[in-house]
A protein has these predicted regions:
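C-terminal interaction appendages of subunits in large macromolecular complexes
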Residues: 2-5, 9-13, 18-21, 25, ...
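Long insertion/accessory domains within large nucleic-acid-processing enzymes
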Residues: 32-48, 53-56, 61
Length: 255
């Protein structure tokens, strides 16, 4: 809740060329000032940040991705314009959610998602054994630790989870996520217990992926990974050309 993220450098990547004739402008909602129609992003921010939205008859669910991976894939596409999905997936192997939880979707399924623009990503909590107990040290994206404890406690009260004797939330500043599940005895199969909890609580979640965006042609459509990157490369080439033309015009005015 109180984590501070310093995004100044990243914001510069999105805004640095704004005053250099790179994009078109339009009036804002009340006509009091003009605002850019798009930002002259120097990186494919749509893939990096991810987004979600819904409209009549369509929806968009794009997960976030790793900055280095996306940039490397884009450079590969520039060097090899005919690169296929498999070649791009050497660099972008899966989405990159802001958590240490594990993505359990197979690499083959992930490639199919990037190829078709549709699918789902499965993610489960990361845990380890400690003094005979289970310690959860990372939860799936947007999963609340208190809600997970409530779900487990409800099963204990309903006598559907006889293997567990105690729950503790030991999360603190040093360990943002540390949920302890104490088994009833040392004879409890922890792997079997966790398999049950993965199936019945939010310790395992599925995230829908739908790469439905408005393309360079101004029309919405589901796009594959390579189509998204190619659209951005096309946009970036237009942006760079407009920037150079703007600078040339300024120089000619001074001569």
């Amino acid at each position: 809740r109180y984590t501070e993220s310093k995004l100044t450098k990243y914001a510069d990547v999105l805004l640095a060329e704004l005053g250099q004739g790179t994009v078109d402008w339009q009036p804002n909602f009340d006509g009091s000032l003009d605002e850019p129609m798009v930002l002259p992003a120097q990186v494919p921010n749509l893939l990096l940040n991810g987004t979600t939205g819904i409209a009549v008859g369509m929806a968009t669910d794009i997960p976030p991705h790793n900055l280095r991976e996306v940039v490397n894939a884009t450079i590969h596409l520039l060097d090899h314009p005919d690169a296929a999905i498999d070649a791009l997936c050497v660099h972008i192997q899966a989405p990159d959610f802001p958590t240490d939880a594990e993505i359990t979707t197979s690499p083959e399924e992930v490639r199919d998602i990037y190829r078709t623009g549709r699918g789902s990503i499965r993610m489960r909590a990361a845990w380890h054994r400690e003094d005979g107990a289970v310690v959860l040290h990372a939860l799936p994206y947007q999963v609340s630790g208190s809600k997970v404890l409530e779900q487990i406690a409800a099963q204990m009260q309903a006598k559907k989870l006889p293997r567990v004797s105690d729950l503790r939330d030991e999360s603190d500043h040093e360990h943002p996520t540390r949920l302890v599940i104490v088994p009833r005895s040392n004879r409890v199969d922890l792997d079997a217990m966790m398999s049950h909890l993965f199936a019945t609580t939010d310790l395992e979640r599925t995230y829908r992926v739908n790469l439905n965006v408005i393309g360079m042609n101004g029309r919405p459509g589901v796009r594959s990974l390579d189509m998204l990157l190619r659209d951005w490369v096309q946009f970036r080439r237009q942006t760079v050309r407009r920037r150079l033309e703007y600078r040339l015009e300024r120089v000619l005015c001074l001569l």
